């Protein structure tokens, strides 16, 4: 991505934040998280081969990527007061220590 792409992306995110309520954005995030959980479950089923899905591995991976991007988009549109980088850093450090 170049600087122009980031500027356009930021403008689109601002548009969503101004025109879609916080409640609606949180509802969207919860729906996307549920779809992500289903996509991860199908991916795990395919990896384990215990209860495989009829979809191909490529389809499953593409679906997982799409759900990840849906969540990322929702997170990009979360209100600034919900973002706390101290918590982020603490969680990241804990993960590294494991």
Model-derived regions: residue spans:
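Flexible "arm" and connector segments at domain edges
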Residues: 1-98
């Amino acid at each position: 991505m170049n600087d122009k792409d980031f500027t356009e992306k930021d403008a689109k995110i601002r548009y969503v934040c101004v025109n879609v309520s916080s409640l609606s954005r949180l509802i969207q995030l919860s729906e996307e998280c549920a779809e992500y959980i289903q996509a991860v479950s199908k991916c795990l089923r395919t990896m384990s081969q215990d209860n495989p899905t009829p979809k191909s591995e490529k389809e499953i991976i593409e679906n997982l990527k799409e759900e990840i991007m849906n969540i990322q988009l929702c997170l990009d549109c979360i209100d600034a007061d919900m973002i706390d980088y101290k918590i982020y850093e603490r969680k990241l450090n804990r993960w590294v220590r494991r």
